[in-house]
A protein has these predicted regions:
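Flexible, acidic/Gly-rich N-terminal and inter-domain linker regions that tether
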Residues: 1-35, 39, 47
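Canonical Radical SAM [4Fe-4S] cluster-binding loop centered on the CxxxCxxC motif
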Residues: 29-72, 76
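Short, small-residue-rich loop/turn micro-motifs
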Residues: 16, 43-45, 160-162
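Solvent-exposed, flexible loop/coil residues
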Residues: 6, 43, 61, 69, ...
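Short acidic, gly/pro-rich beta-turn/loop elements at beta-sheet edges
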Residues: 22-24, 34-35, 49, 103, ...
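Conserved AdoMet/S-adenosylmethionine-binding subsite of the radical SAM
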Residues: 79-205
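Short linear Ser/Thr-Pro motifs
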Residues: 5, 40-41, 131, 159
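A structure-centric signal for secondary-structure junctions around beta-strands
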Residues: 9, 21, 33-34, 46, ...
Length: 205
């Protein structure tokens, strides 16, 4: 299923092999020739952020997407706009669709590695942004955000949405487990390692 808005945004509802569905979105710039693709990384999500469309559909993680399923979203959308032979190009990726990338780190890493590979899709590190609510899990005995600085080495966007702990917990229950103050040192390490600015995501409620 494909939906188009007046501003040129294109939303795809994609069916996977197991008949599950995920969404992918192409967001155009003003010229309508350059697109940012918004990728999903899982079917469902248990984080239950109040403002998230996924949380309105499912408050549980059904399954993570494989690296191939993540990359296939890019290839399908490239085919749709004929990225390969026309002036229209998907120039940027944001992993901000369905699911939390930091809860599917192994598969996200493989997908990003293939995206950056010179024999693959050839996206530079500053053309890819990974979003995180700030899941403070451990990966290979270090904090996941610190691990991602080395293994992903792309832009990081922190899904903050409120700097008031009580309010953030109300709209993002994960804040009860991984507080703002506990995540700031990890985010500083990410910047120190990558020298890439960290984006702050903030929804107007």
């Amino acid at each position: 299923d494909i939906q188009k808005s007046k501003d040129g945004t294109i939303k795809f509802l994609l069916e996977l092999k197991d008949k599950r569905n995920v969404e992918t979105v192409l967001i155009p710039d003003k010229s309508q020739s350059r697109y940012t693709i918004c990728l999903s990384v899982s079917v469902g999500c248990y984080l239950s952020c109040e403002f998230c469309a996924t949380a309105q559909i499912s408050k549980k993680l059904v399954r993570n997407l494989t690296p191939g399923e993540i990359i296939s979203q890019i290839i399908l959308c490239k085919d749709y706009i004929d990225d390969w032979s026309t002036q229209k190009k998907i120039t940027n990726q944001v992993l901000m669709g369905e699911g939390s990338p930091f809860l599917n780190l192994d598969n996200v890493k493989v997908a990003i590695d293939n995206s950056k590979n010179k024999d693959g899709l050839e996206y530079g590190r500053t053309r890819i942004t990974v979003s995180t609510v700030g899941v403070g899990i451990k990966k290979d005995n270090i904090d996941a955000i610190e691990w991602a600085a080395k293994e992903l080495d792309v832009y990081l966007a922190w899904s903050l949405h409120s700097s008031i702990p009580k309010h953030r917990s109300e709209i993002m229950p994960i804040n009860e487990k991984y507080s703002i103050n506990s995540l700031i040192p990890q985010l500083k390490k990410y910047y120190e390692k990558t020298k890439l600015p960290i984006f702050i995501e903030w929804i107007c409620l």
